[in-house]
Amino acid sequence: MSARLRVADVRAELQRRGLDVSGTKPALVRRLDAAICEAEKAVVAAAPTSVANGYDVAVDGKRNCGNNKRKRSGDGGEEGNGDTCTDVTKLEGMSYRELQGLAKARGVAANGGKKDVIQRLLSATAGPAAVADGGPLGAKEVIKGGDEEVEVKKEKMVTATKKGAAVLDQHIPDHIKVNYHVLQVGDEIYDATLNQTNVGDNNNKFYIIQVLESDAGGSFMVYNRWGRVGVRGQDKLHGPSPTRDQAIYEFEGKFHNKTNNHWSDRKNFKCYAKKYTWLEMDYGETEKEIEKGSITDQIKETKLETRIAQFISLICNISMMKQRMVEIGYNAEKLPLGKLRKATILKGYHVLKRISDVISKADRRHLEQLTGEFYTVIPHDFGFRKMREFIIDTPQKLKAKLEMVEALGEIEIATKLLEDDSSDQDDPLYARYKQLHCDFTPLEADSDEYSMIKSYLRNTHGKTHSGYTVDIVQIFKVSRHGETERFQKFASTRNRMLLWHGSRLSNWAGILSQGLRIAPPEAPVTGYMFGKGVYFADMFSKSANYCYASEACRSGVLLLCEVALGDMNELLNADYDANNLPKGKLRSKGVGQTAPNMVESKVADDGVVVPLGEPKQEPSKRGGLLYNEYIVYNVDQIRMRYVLHVNFNFKRR
């Protein structure tokens, strides 16, 4: 209950109750929780009970407020079914400190003035329910302050339950979860997650519909939950229905009401203004426990060499992938990474392509509409900030969202890979390793190859990238199955170079298993400075920046690839159609103002040039780039040679 409060707040509440305020935070929390429980019992004992009418069952103790029904505006109250009754005067009567405590307990920002905090609580879907009149809305904390009581809805650990193809919504009451599952009839799974973002109306909301069937058979319910993305929202359970057909009828009616699409024709789904969009889910074996035992145990028990095992456990970590995506705004709760479909990712690309077509026209209204479409297809959690702050209206914002969708594409591949249990699960790390279709050989630190790569890394760290240094954790020699054969036709091409490629940590299971790939036709060409291709650099730090490491996650992974360059089409400025190469040219080069001194390059025995010289200025090159970029439009020109695992050390400013 109180664990989310700061120590100072816990002590303040204890002091108000005349209780001991000494001790560590765990002791203080236990003391306050015990006092809250006693107060809670007194409130519940004195409160009237609520009765469900007809087929409407109150969920988690929520009361039907009778004639006090009113429809709330905003994301949370569109049902207008009277599940909660908002008492604004009660919020206004609270002290600022009490409002802050309530906001923190509801997961709402508690900064700003008193009016700001009240407005956030009123905007929150579940916030008003915490201060409703007329008795308990479930188990509550009661924090006494002076002559007032602040009722804070008690936080409860929620878990997802999977029985059958679909996961029961995590907020369905436990006594229902134990006895019910999501209805499946043949290939039809009666489970729908809907999303709607309207930038102009500041809406970013979800709607969940599920038909529940009792495990024993013969009893059916329809469950709804709705609210602003990022909060629990409100929920309602209809039933039990007399027949399965009646429950399906209610489900399909609600789906049509919210989307203006028929459930039976959802594969041809059309989006409508002010209506929800259906998020297509993958009902394969998702959410399964991929690992048996801890990572440490797996590393000890695997037949893999320890350094390889540690690297595989790093890049094949679903929790890491989820965290990386959450950091850049993606809502992994609403559309779990394991349920991503390729079709959803292509829809995201398609909307970004349409945004790129109008981004230079300064058509604000059109950009608002398209931005809403993008956030509807690719759910984001913006909390209660104004949606207009997140309009995709500049090339930089477009590129950031393009990189997000690319990362989701890699993760979609990775999650399917990691959920494949056809391999040897007695040694899960070895199974993951085999699924990458790559052979790894660790390089020893005293080897010539290691020394050469270390020099290449150190020498080509640009002066403009001075905010961090890196330490090499491990270097692997790598061979992707089938890549050498495809590269063979370019093996004798002159001008082959060893070049850098960096990417997010979450992308590497997908990249290594599938190879480096070119963006699909659905992606906007304007997001790529020299057209759609695979980009490389001869400066380590230029590629290292694309690892997007942080203080929270300092690990980064980069590739060194042999790239067949041949005759190059040199460009000083952006050219989105650069993939249409002039005759005789094999790839493009964006020419930078600083580049490794080619006189100091090393030539390997197989003729590959390693540009590891110290950087030098190229005064004659006055284009738009600080450093060189090499772009190939045919992946057969690429052969992976080395994988580097590094740690970033960020300098304090």
UniProtKB/Swiss-Prot annotation:
What UniProt keywords apply to this chain's record, in alphabetical order?
ADP-ribosylation, DNA-binding, Glycosyltransferase, NAD, Nucleotidyltransferase, Nucleus, Repeat, Transferase
- What residue stretches are annotated with the PARP catalytic domain? 427-653
Write the signal peptide boundaries: none
GO annotation, biological process: double-strand break repair
The entry's cellular-component GO terms read: nucleolus
Query: Which residue intervals define the domain SAP in the entry?
Result: 2-36, 91-125
Which locations, inside or outside the cell, does it occupy?
Answer: Nucleus
The record's listing under Pfam families reads:
PARP, PARP_reg, SAP, WGR
- UniProt domain PARP alpha-helical: residue ranges: 301-419
Q: Which reaction does it catalyse?
A: NAD(+) + (ADP-D-ribosyl)n-acceptor = nicotinamide + (ADP-D-ribosyl)n+1-acceptor + H(+); L-aspartyl-[protein] + NAD(+) = 4-O-(ADP-D-ribosyl)-L-aspartyl-[protein] + nicotinamide; L-glutamyl-[protein] + NAD(+) = 5-O-(ADP-D-ribosyl)-L-glutamyl-[protein] + nicotinamide
For this chain, one GO molecular function annotation is: NAD+ poly-ADP-ribosyltransferase activity
For this protein, the Enzyme Commission number is 2.4.2.30, 2.4.2.-
* Region of interest (Disordered), residue spans: 64-84
Q: Where is this motif: Nuclear localization signal?
A: 69-72
**Where is each WGR domain found?**
179-276
The main location is: nucleus
Q: What does this protein do?
A: Involved in the base excision repair (BER) pathway, by catalyzing the poly(ADP-ribosyl)ation of a limited number of acceptor proteins involved in chromatin architecture and in DNA metabolism. This modification follows DNA damages and appears as an obligatory step in a detection/signaling pathway leading to the reparation of DNA strand breaks.
Q: Which family does it belong to?
A: Belongs to the ARTD/PARP family.
Protein name as catalogued: Poly [ADP-ribose] polymerase 2
